UniProtKB/Swiss-Prot annotation:
GO terms of molecular function: metal ion binding; stearoyl-[ACP] desaturase activity
Family affiliation: Belongs to the fatty acid desaturase type 2 family.
Organism: Thunbergia alata
PANTHER family from the UniProt entry: ACYL- ACYL-CARRIER-PROTEIN DESATURASE-RELATED, STEAROYL-[ACYL-CARRIER-PROTEIN] 9-DESATURASE 5, CHLOROPLASTIC
GO annotation, cellular component aspect: chloroplast stroma
UniProt pathway annotation: Lipid metabolism; fatty acid metabolism
A UniProt-annotated Pfam family: FA_desaturase_2
Keyword Lipid biosynthesis attributed: yes
GO biological process: fatty acid biosynthetic process
Name by which UniProt lists this protein: Acyl-[acyl-carrier-protein] 6-desaturase
Effect of S231N: Catalytic activity converted to a delta(9)-18:0-ACP desaturase. Gain of a delta(9) desaturase activity with both 18:0-ACP and 16:0-ACP
Catalytic activity field: hexadecanoyl-[ACP] + 2 reduced [2Fe-2S]-[ferredoxin] + O2 + 2 H(+) = (6Z)-hexadecenoyl-[ACP] + 2 oxidized [2Fe-2S]-[ferredoxin] + 2 H2O
InterPro entries registered for this protein in UniProt: Fatty_acid_desaturase-2 (IPR005067), Ferritin-like_SF (IPR009078), RNR-like (IPR012348)
Enzyme Commission code(s) on record: 1.14.19.26
Length: 387
């Protein structure tokens, strides 16, 4: 029995397929109206005891594929991790609080950040808030069939990877959070509330607890965050803030290494199960690679994610173009266009995925126009100033 995915032919293609991961692509769809709802207060939410129906539960023989990969994961994926003693830590880049010159170091940092423009600060805060929601991302992997951490300290390689990946990622939000706090340029209490709201809201990437879908999603997102932090570093360098450029570049390098690991997993799945992996990729693209911080809000602006996304698009940090670039990279990286021996459904899935980049390119200008034309709004992160 194969891993069951709904027939590609049985679905209508979403109009222009604009409801995908790039914030701008997501918002160009049909109207510019908000599509993200402000979560109701906890006391007003209806809690159902019925679990959401999973559309694509993992078949036993598919689970066996992942169980059979333990040795491969240990030999091939775990080496992507860096030993803790060889890893950078936030204190390597920030003023030393034990030093007699701490106050002078902080003052110097504040001078360097004084000229960072508001739109850049909004983009940097949004990226940091996304990183700080790390508990949500670990939860996603630990609710995924077969690869989840059964005990919380499981020695199974899949679980070892997830814990160590989380530990490496934890430094990213930590360092930028401390940097922003020391800069004095932003309203930390509003930022902290945004982080708490986001973690409390969670996320549903549409992976249905299915490891095929989960690893495709993480491959995509790790590359997206590598691009975003690389762009933030480039802009910081242009503004003369070399320390921040170094911080962003260091984070981006981590994300590239993590992307390489997740992409390697999907590459192996294409080798072991080309049909099932092809159908999974097509399904994930139909579902859209939703941004992990899509439910971001600060308790005031229910459309904060849209507004933050527009700022990032305008600055060229992460745009509709990058979204399409990632898809093209993945198609080439996994040899999707060269797969042979697929069933009729598999070939339809292959044609669908390989045809998406051309369709996305046609709407990039519309996505940029959306970002340029959206009204500038006040951001609580920068004391209500408009961006």
């Amino acid at each position: 029995m194969a891993l069951v995915f709904k027939s590609i032919g049985a679905h209508k293609t979403p109009p222009c397929t604009l409801n995908l991961a790039s914030p701008a692509l997501y918002h160009t769809r049909v109207t510019m109206a908000s599509t993200i709802t402000h979560p109701p207060p906890l006391k007003d939410r209806k809690i159902s005891s019925t679990r959401r129906v999973r559309t694509y539960p993992l078949a036993p023989e598919k689970a066996e594929i992942f169980n059979s990969m333990h040795g491969w994961v240990e030999d091939t994926i775990l080496p992507f991790l860096k030993p803790v003693e060889e890893s950078w830590q936030p204190t390597d880049f920030l003023p030393d609080s034990t030093s007699d010159g701490f106050h002078e170091q902080v003052e110097e940092l504040r001078k360097r950040t004084a000229d960072l423009p508001d739109d850049y600060l909004v983009a940097l805060v949004g990226a940091m808030v996304t990183e700080e929601a790390l508990p949500t991302y670990q939860t996603m992997l630990n609710t995924t069939d077969v690869i989840y951490d059964e005990s919380g300290a499981s020695p199974v390689p899949w679980a070892v990877w997830t814990r160590a990946w989380t530990a490496e990622e934890n430094r990213h939000g930590d360092i930028v959070n401390k940097y922003l706090y020391l800069s004095g340029r932003v309203d930390m209490k509003q930022i902290e509330k945004t982080i708490q709201y986001l973690i409390g809201s969670g996320m549903d990437p549409g992976a249905d607890n299915n490891p095929y879908l989960a690893y495709i999603y993480t491959s995509y997102q790790e590359r997206a965050t590598a691009i975003s932090h690389g762009s933030l570093g480039r802009l910081a360098r242009q503004k003369g803030e070399m320390k921040l450029a170094q911080i962003c570049g260091t984070i981006s390098a981590d994300e590239k290494r993590h992307e390489a690991a997740y992409s390697k997993i999907v590459e192996k799945l294409f080798e072991l199960d080309p049909e099932g992996t092809m159908l999974a990729l097509a399904y994930m693209m139909k579902m859209k690679i939703v941004m992990p911080a899509r439910l971001m809000h600060d308790g005031k602006d229910p459309d904060m994610f849209q507004h933050f996304s527009a700022v990032s698009q305008r600055l060229g940090i992460y745009t509709a173009k990058e979204y399409t670039d990632i898809l093209e990279h993945m198609i080439a990286r996994w040899g999707v266009d060269k797969l042979t021996g697929l069933s009729g459904e598999g070939r339809r899935a292959q044609d669908y995925v390989c045809g998406l980049p051309m369709r996305f390119r046609k709407v990039e200008e519309r996505a940029q126009a959306w970002a340029e034309n959206i009204s500038h709004v006040p951001f609580s992160w920068i004391f209500g100033r408009r961006v």
